[in-house]
């Protein structure tokens, strides 16, 4: 099982920093003794947030998610988090989950990357209609605090932003190249415009704010880095988009969790000296730090311009639009890149968190260097636990080569078989030799597979069968990876 994204937080160092701030009396202000609902609570950030709220003494933490399980669900239940399965697009589910809550942290969303980005209707349904359902339930149950986890895409659409801040205007809705950015922008504006709205019974008001993170990283992150690593492992990170000087924002998971909790504190209306005037009410905040990636696999050797990459992204978008009925199927791989993703990686855009620092006392819990070190360590450990192997091009070469030999040696002369037979005879002279080469190759592959299984039982027992099948298919091209792992195992 993957480790919890927030297994522990060093509260002493955090408390020392927070005591210097004037907004709150303690790190648990507004958390201790309160009931929280985290929509999207079984996700990577949502689970980390739930665990941290429990650690800070929340009376009850509810995880509200469409799924009934995730890699972190056992940790949540063992920590006392109440996991509620429901759909944010169903009013009755939302109403039931939010009943009796003191604060709602709305993280549930759809369409951030990959195939999800092309499911426009689902993006609107979850991001806009779902947020409307949350707002409606918040007013019905007179919940005074709502933190909306938005995205920097509400102000970014492919044009360079250098050290941007909260004064940037919303990116025009009609100019967004993806449904995710557009729908999140609409939802954020709905949330912020609801700030200060009184409840029907009078007296109390709803206070809202929005947090605008960028791409999230950290140990166990399950969306961005796995996709990058898988592409690198298959040898499909063929090019880099944009200039070498491009800078983009990433945020470490623990820093984002801290940001969301501080934002919820900033909506309190009973802070000494600020009664009735929550510092964060109606405000959006950026919580970001520049992030440089480092991978053990081969990095892209070529660079293409943003316009060329956008054209390539449009081609993939067109192909996958035709495949729309099957976008939710697991067997359909992720598109290599889409237009919105081109802008995210190929155009400089980074932001200042000065406003969050001044108004909420936000100081990143971990530096980019610390966060990157923890993430790399996690991926190195994960790589050691998984089956390693050659790129997809090696797979294609071996499979095509063996298939061609089999076709040349045994299949009737139809289709490409005459050409393959002529090519095989050019190298091996006789049909007997062609067939012998194929049989010997198969025998050698199976023999190597058996040896790989035997060796893996000693150095990588969890993946022994995987090594057998992969080496039986690829022979030496797989065996060399196992031999390297065996060498590392003996040196450890």
Question: PLM features: residue spans?
Answer:
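NAD(P)H-binding glycine-rich loop region in Rossmannoid oxidoreductase-like domains
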Residues: 81-129, 137, 141, 157
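NAD(P)-dependent short-chain dehydrogenase/reductase
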Residues: 193-268, 291
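Mid/C-terminal beta-alpha module of Rossmann-like enzyme folds, strongest
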Residues: 266-336, 373, 383-387
